Curated annotation (Swiss-Prot):
Cofactor: Mg(2+)
Record-linked Pfam families: IPPT
Gene designation: miaA
Keyword Ion transport set for record: no
Binding site for substrate: 12-17
One GO biological process term: tRNA modification
Protein's name according to its UniProt entry: tRNA dimethylallyltransferase
GO MF terms held by the record: ATP binding; tRNA dimethylallyltransferase activity
Classification of source organism: Bacteria, Bacillati, Actinomycetota, Actinomycetes, Bifidobacteriales
Entry-linked Gene3D superfamilies: 1.10.20.140, P-loop containing nucleotide triphosphate hydrolases (3.40.50.300)
Assembly behavior: Monomer.
Residue(s) at site: Interaction with substrate tRNA: 106, 127
Organism: Bifidobacterium longum subsp. infantis (strain ATCC 15697 / DSM 20088 / JCM 1222 / NCTC 11817 / S12)
EC number from the UniProt entry: 2.5.1.75
Amino acid sequence: MTQRVVSIVGPTASGKTGLGIAIARRLAEAGERAEIVNADAYQMYRGMDIGTAKPTAEEQAVVSHHLIDIIDPEDTMSVARFQQLARETIADLQSRGIRPILVGGSGLYARAAIDDITFPGTDPDVRTRLEEREKTEGAGALFDELRAKDPEAAARMDPRNPRRTIRALEVIELTGKPYSASLPRYRYVIPSVQIGLDLDRPDLDHRIDLRTKQMYDDGFIEEVERLRPHLGATAVRALGYQQIIDLLDGIWDVNDAFADIAQKTKRLARKQMGWFGRDPRIHWLQALNPKLVDNAMAIIAHADAGDYDSIDARADEYTQHHLGDITA
C-alpha cells in the first residue's frame, strides 16, 4: 500500500480549502498526520488575503499549511519555481511521515507539483526574431516549419494560435529537442490521487456572488489600497485587484467594480472546469453532498490500495488520442 499525495482540485469557490482541512482532520482521527500544500498561484503572495480567498489564520491553525505567504507582491512566482518548491515540500513532508494534501485552483500549478511536466527556458532574442517572422511570413509558414520539425507537436496544436507555434519553435531552437518532449503529460511522477469538486452552475454562481459580497464586507478595497504601491506585474493580475485599482482611480463605482469581479470569477470558474475536465484521473464528487468527506476518504483508501493504478497508467495515452492539444 502506497500513501498517495491527495490533490484537491476544482473551480474557484467550490470549497477546496474546507475539504482539504476536513480530510486532514479525518486522517488525524485515524492516527495519520497530514498537512496542506498550497497550489494557488496568488495565495503565495504576502498580504493578498481577501482577494485570493486565502485560508484564514484560524483555518491555518487547525491544519499546517505550506507555500502560503512566501513571497512579496513585488516579486514574481513562476510555475517552474513553484514546481521546485512544491516538490521539495512534498518530499520533506513524506520523509517525516506526513501525508501532503495539495489544494489549489491553479490548474497548471497543481499538475506541476505531481505530474511529468518540464518547463524549458526562454530567450527574448529568439522569441522576438520568431515574432518578426510571423509578421512578415505569416503564421502558416511558421506552423509548416513546426510540422516539419516536430510532427507530433503540430498534430496536437491549433495552427490558428501563432503564440503557441512560436513557443514551440523557440523551445526546439533552445533545447535541440522536439517540443513534444516537453509537453505536459498526464502521468504522475509522485504517486497521487486527485479529487475534484463539482457543483451545478447555479449553485457555483451563487457561491461566487456570496464570496464577492464577502470580499467587500471584509475590506477588499482597503487591502488593495494598502498593497497598490507594492503590486508587481504578476501579482496585479490576480482577479479583482485591477478592478479595485480602477475603482480607486474613479473609473468605476463600487457596484460596477464588484459586479465585474463576480462576472469574471464566474467566467474563470467555467474555464477551470474545462481545464480539469480534460484529466481522466480526477475523481469528481458533488461539493454539496452531505457525505462529501466520507466519499473523499473512500477514494483515498482505494488509491492507496492501488485500485486506480491501471486507469492512471492509461490517462496520458487517452488524452493524446481523444482530447488533442493538452497544452490548453
